[in-house]
Amino acid sequence: DAALNAFGFRMGPYQMSDLAGLDIGWKKGATTANPIRDALCELDRRGQKTGAGNYDYDENRRPIPSDVTAKIIADVTGVEAGGAPGQDEIIATCIYPMINEGLKILEEKMAQRASDIDIVWLNGYGWPADKGGPMLYGDMVGAEAVLATMEKLGAEDDQFAPCATLKRLAADGGHFIDVQP
């Protein structure tokens, strides 16, 4: 969350999950693809409504890093607090898939132009205005950087495989904002 807050989002995904409630879609005793959430919910750490979730919360609902959550993360992942990736890697891992998905939306002709995607993110999802939206941000970091991250993520999980348009932009030195269906 700290990395995405520093990027400019008001909330990171764990803060947002706590706000919505970790138990949405969770069933006691069921095993899901999210063992950290399962463990938190089993301990009745269901987010802000219970005063604890990914974070502990004070009386003003301010998030406080949780030792309980840190232990669960360490137990599930084998990574101790402080052993996590750096801010730049976290941002790339969270943001670059949005850029790749934006290109897929354009490939599927679900949007007319890249700037339409940026407008939705800026006005609908709280994208940081100084970053211009995911497609313009893609131009700020460059298609080659986005492609390298997506190839790495795609090697671990096919859903993150780089789309054809991303490969073309990286090869040709093209710009995300110029892509049209």
Regions found by a protein language model. Give the residues of each.
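N-terminal glycine-rich phosphate-binding loop for ADP-containing cofactors
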Residues: D1-P181
